[in-house]
Amino acid sequence: LTNERLKNVMLQLDDDLSDVNQVHSLLSNDINLVLSRYKNENWYNYQAAQRMNEYTVSNSFIDTIVYVDNKTDSILSSGKHVYKEDGIYYVYTGTHYLPFPMMQYTDSNKSQLIFLSDETSSLLLYLPYNSNVESYSIFYVISAKDLQTTLETGSFNGITSACLVTSDNRIVSGIHTDTIRPYLDGLVKE
């Protein structure tokens, strides 16, 4: 029964990411973003930013959509401030910026969840697969609140704690993480 509940949480996370992929597909083909790519003019960038805001509002799992034009180095964001310096993107957490070395992840042939963190803040990013021949990149900041809600839905009837962890056992999000942390310290990466 517990395994079934945990499986349901995993399925919900998978559904949430599938919804982000659907937004990504729609956004990649959105005429406003296409025009902003080929006619780097303020009006088209404004229209593209408006569409990104609409897509962000329509999916609560997305906190921010970030669109990067790789030709012009222009950045559009539907929420958090993002800038680029020396090839590194910096994403504002609400108190300071976390570095995101996106180029380290673009050679993958898979979509990726990327956890950025320091001593005081963290962000979970979703970077959909993007071929290196594309002239743009889009990544998504996942809503910490909605991720937490998804994990909380599985925390009833015998499940006292649940968390999403990185491959090196850092907790991305969870409920009652203090009870599970001692077990994570003893896990060996497979």
Predicted segments with their positions:
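Intrinsic low-complexity, intrinsically disordered coil/linker regions enriched in small/polar
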Residues: D146-E190
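Short, surface-exposed beta-strand-loop junctions and turns on beta-sheet-rich folds
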Residues: V82-K84, S131, D178-I180
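Soluble sensory domains of the PAS superfamily and closely related sensory modules
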Residues: T93-S111, D185-E190
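Conserved beta-strands of PAS-like sensory domains
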Residues: Y90-H96, S117-S155, S173
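Residue-level signal for well-ordered, solvent-exposed loop/turn and beta-edge residues enriched
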Residues: D73, V133, N169-I171
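A structure-centric signal for secondary-structure junctions around beta-strands
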Residues: N21, I62, E134-Y136, G154, ...
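N-terminal sensory and localization modules of signal-transduction and trafficking proteins
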Residues: L1-K7, L35-N40, G79-Y83, D107-F115, ...
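Extracytoplasmic/periplasmic sensory segments of membrane signal-transduction proteins
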Residues: T2-P101
